[in-house]
């Protein structure tokens, strides 16, 4: 089995469907004997350019090890799902398990936000 990195963007009005979509896609990979090495839900983000007059989309990143049949099935599913605006599937040489730069940047900002909130609470007292 080969390793793949999959990113897909979902219509912002369909964001509530994302957990179900992730569950379906990961389920099909696992049923075929594949593995999910990394799964990140980046949430709703600004697009670099408008797609179908939309300026935001819900991003999901998956790193999987799966047979080619499952990848073909995912491609077909993405193509015929109107909620998926764009997708990319890239074959990688190795399994990628460390956090992506998007998640690392978010984690670096969180402690600062917590400190700021504590300072704000102290100022109120």
Swiss-Prot record:
Residues 99-125 are annotated as: Disordered. InterPro entries: Ribosomal_bS6, Ribosomal_bS6_CS, Ribosomal_bS6_sf, Ribosomal_S6_plastid/chlpt, Transl_elong_EF1B/ribsomal_bS6. Residues 116-125 have a biased composition (Acidic residues). Belongs to the bacterial ribosomal protein bS6 family. This is Small ribosomal subunit protein bS6. Keywords: Ribonucleoprotein, Ribosomal protein, RNA-binding, rRNA-binding. It comes from Histophilus somni (strain 2336) (Haemophilus somnus). One of its GO terms (cellular component) is cytosolic small ribosomal subunit.
